[in-house]
Amino acid sequence: MDNKAWFTRRELLRAAALGAAALPFSQLTAWARQRQFVEPARVPYSGSDDALLDEVERTAFDFFWTEAGKTGQAKDRALLNGNDTHTVASIAATGFGLSGLCIAEARGYRKKDEIVERVRGTLRFLWRDLPHEHGFYYHFIDMNTGARQWKCEISSIDTSLLLCGVLTARQHFSDPEIQDLATKIYGRVDWPWMLNGGKTLSMGWHPESGFLNARWNQYCELMMIYLLGLGSPTHPLPAETWTAWKRPTINFQGLEYISGNDPLFTHQYSQAWFDFRGKRDAYANYFMNSVKATVVHKQFCLSLHDEFPDYSEHLWGITSSDSAKGYTAWGGPPRLGELDGSVVPCAAGGSLPFLYPDCMEVLRTIKEHYPKAWGRYGFVDAFNPLTGWYNPDVLGIDLGITMLMAENQRTGFIWNTFMKNKEAQNGMNKAGFHPQHA
């Protein structure tokens, strides 16, 4: 793919804007409103489901282990079956990868000493060698040298995704060097600088032109940025930044939830690390909000069945991904992007804890009935059963969200590990989170 066709998710969104499975939707809506918060590991599922999720996690880990440079920085993308020559890494993919290394060590996917040394090397490079501005990193870098790629931005969201992985590693590994480096990397970030005098955070900064005009001022994947900033012991954000961003709502066939006109991943990313189950702030229970968003997205896909006959109870899910024409932000409701019948596996994979039986059925259907959609690193980024198009690539962030949410569904491991960080707890406390009482 031409490098010029590679865009960030948020750039595309800015451009666009400038057993419940068998129930009728009316009953799905009622079910979503009444759903009880339970630990994912307590949700009953079969041994075959567990085996598939383990395979999903192992293959994703293979990507993060194999497709990383000597610096530990994970590639933005690679060919589905390896033997890839891309050298561009994404700091967001590295954040998912660091969390994946914690899963791999806990599950014995590789020897502990090998994994510990990989984590050490990754953090050393982040602290000593990777260019930064006030602690924030460039979105895309060369995986071997750390050099900025494509004149990309210093990214507040991608730095936050990286930091979530850094803090997960600090909590999981008892190695003193890992803990020290992780603390320093997080502590160096100057969160108020990214406010640039405003009430909400900028999406990024360019050395050539300064801060981006676009701001994190409306609900999306932004919660992790503000919570990390609020919890910072060195350069904290003021508490009022949590209430400064808007929380618009969508009402789809009677089910209302907080969302912008954004793809499904915006309801997933912060929740891969921050555990919102059974908690709420002054506005919402955001875990339940993501349950509703997933229920509605499934029904939205089913409503397109006449246009795209392959969409069914067993096969649905669209979120930002590659398409046959290049990377695109698409989904709904409301309808976003030039939908063409493609299926994006990480849409279901990233929502496993929110709508487990339905999402698991999608992954099983793809694995069993679309063999070209599976390879060395797991599921392709996207495919189109209507046209027969299969993406030759996988994306690190899409493998990453599926891996982390699969593990959260199985054991809650990433939630339980990350939330032991006192900074994560402090951030949620400053934002006003408290237990949700029935």
What are these regions (language model features)?
Residues L13, F37-A438:
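Ser/Thr/Asn(+Pro)-rich, low-complexity disordered segments
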Residues M1-D2, K75:
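Intrinsic-disorder/low-complexity regions
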Residues D2-W6, E11-A32:
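N-terminal export signals
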